[in-house]
Amino acid sequence: MLWFSQEITRRLGNERFAGYVSKFDYGNTDVAGNAGKNDGLTRSWVNSSLEISPVEQAIFMRRLLAGELPVSDKAHAMTRAILPSFRAGGWTVHGKTGTTRLGDSADKRSDGWRSLGWFVGWANKDSRSIVFARLVIDTKRSDTPKGPQTRAVFLKELPNLADKSN
């Protein structure tokens, strides 16, 4: 939830927040926020200066699962434990959604705001484990939050995708 993330970053403060993002090597690590708005602490990751690709998201998840982020073992375990889990064709899927909107200035389109949805996490089935990052950007205006839709489609497709990778 956005408000909760903003409360955490406020409590961390600018220097500690920027330090963690840098130590985590999270995306482009730019937490400055929107130019002239002094909002990096509460908005840098919301369609602003902090950017990350699907590949970088998957690498981050791999590091989380391997306990390789610069935090305690307890912090790794707690983070893994609080992510929601879902079932999909025998797979147990753990992940987090994200939704934002891309406007004309960001995507250079004339169709107004478009919804962007993430679903990032990992899945286990028997002895197999995978990490994933699914990013979907609507091709036209949409008022529906894209993150939950992205998750639903991914969960439906996962069994077939995983079978093809064998």
Task: Describe each region flagged by the PLM.
Residues Q6-A66:
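Mid-domain, small-residue-enriched loop/turn segments at the edges of structured enzyme/sensor domains
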Residues M1-L2, V136:
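Acidic/histidine-rich, surface-exposed loop or edge segments in extracytoplasmic proteins
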Residues R11-G13, R63-N166:
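Structured C-terminal helix/loop/strand segments within mature extracytoplasmic catalytic/sensor domains
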Residues W3, Y26, N47, I52, ...:
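Extracytoplasmic
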